């Protein structure tokens, strides 16, 4: 079955097929709820499902517009006249669209996802540098002592401020690494793309460590201050 609806990547018959949402039949340009991968065509990833280019530095508004357009066009109410099977298929496609949208909402999510598509995991392959491990040990000591030592609490506050500053710097580093990876995709360059994944892994891995430290330090500091014991 086919149903037409508005989508920013499908407004024109000249729109590249790869930039049409996957639920659009590549031959007719119309929504096809029975769509299956064509011969030699891979299963769609999040980018393909939303009809967006496989890039990390995507415009947030473009992601939202693609999601809203697809969810509106795939709303089950539009397919009631075609029977329960069509409604069920629309619901299934809507679920995939929602999953894709949730998986691509932030720059960090998109960076992690392109690593996943390449069969990589930032957490598994990341090896923290000695300087970061030293900070982890220092933070662990301060966290352990913050509940009963006012001086350790002051130290932990300083460490937390430092971790937050590091996190901001890592966000900028990730944007640079993402730009390098995106540049390797047009035209597609497998070697350059593989090389560009290394900085993504490093930044994401370090960000996870710093996020963990921020969370633990914040939790420790939310406990009562030993300098002002409860009566």
Predicted regions and their residues:
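C-terminal accessory/regulatory regions appended to core domains
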Residues: 1-231
């Amino acid at each position: 079955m086919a149903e037409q609806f508005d989508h920013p990547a499908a407004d024109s018959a000249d729109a590249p097929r790869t930039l049409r949402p996957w639920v659009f039949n590549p031959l007719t340009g119309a929504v096809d709820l029975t769509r299956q991968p064509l011969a030699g065509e891979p299963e769609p990833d999040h980018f393909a499902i939303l009809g967006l280019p496989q890039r990390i530095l995507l415009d947030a508004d473009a992601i939202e517009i693609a999601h809203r357009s697809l969810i509106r066009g795939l709303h089950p109410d539009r397919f009631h006249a075609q029977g329960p099977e069509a409604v069920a298929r629309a619901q299934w496609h809507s679920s995939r669209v929602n999953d894709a949208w949730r998986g691509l909402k932030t720059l960090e999510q998109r960076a992690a996802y392109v690593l996943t598509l390449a069969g990589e995991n930032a957490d598994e392959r990341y090896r923290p540098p000695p300087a970061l491990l030293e900070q982890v040990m220092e933070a662990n000591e301060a966290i352990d002592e913050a509940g009963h030592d006012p001086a350790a609490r002051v130290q932990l506050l300083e460490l937390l401020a430092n971790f937050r500053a590091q996190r901001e710097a890592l966000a900028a580093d990730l944007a640079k690494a993402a730009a390098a990876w995106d540049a390797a995709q047009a035209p597609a360059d497998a070697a350059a793309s593989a090389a560009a994944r290394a900085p993504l892994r490093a930044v994401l891995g370090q960000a996870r460590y710093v996020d963990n430290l921020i969370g633990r330090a914040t939790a420790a500091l939310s406990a009562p201050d030993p300098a002002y014991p409860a009566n």
